[in-house]
């Protein structure tokens, strides 16, 4: 009888430990998603001017409006922009310098590419693409506009939820 009781207590103890560990991991992931995210450049203000072209919350801090336009763009976990194209009659395009977190970049018809701090993405004018944060990570990059003639952006459809959720 004592052995049965001891085994029952051991089983209950193991179950409680597993439940506690699972809860602790969940809490750790939640804290990571909501923790303060800092990079070299200030996050900036909520990107309300372009909010209709994003799923989730992004922030924009314009670092330079002279010579070459440079903005620090920060994405909350799960935030991404719609497919879009940077058009130009000559030159144009964009360069991304990843400064923090984990995100993705994808060109139309190609596989998504994971982005980590230090990665550089050269986006020629006329290429349909999107970028954004991983579901469980903040993401930040510098967006450098390549000078060109008659530059303009064309905003397209959001990234399909099924496609985004399939990313690791």
What annotation goes with each model-predicted range?
Residues 1-4:
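Positively charged n-region of N-terminal signal peptides that target proteins for export
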Residues 125-153:
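Ligand-binding loop in jelly-roll beta-barrel domains
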Residues 75-78, 115-136:
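Conserved metal-binding segment of the jelly-roll/cupin
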Residues 77-79, 86-89, 103-107, 130, ...:
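Ligand-binding pocket scaffold of soluble enzyme catalytic domains
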Residues 80, 90-117, 127:
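A short beta-strand-loop-beta hairpin characteristic of the jelly-roll/cupin
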Residues 58-62, 76-97:
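Catalytic core of non-heme Fe(II) oxygenases with the double-stranded beta-helix
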Residues 22-71, 82, 152-168:
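A short, N-terminal "cap"/entry segment at the start of jelly-roll beta-barrel domains
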Residues 8-16:
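Bacterial N-terminal signal peptides
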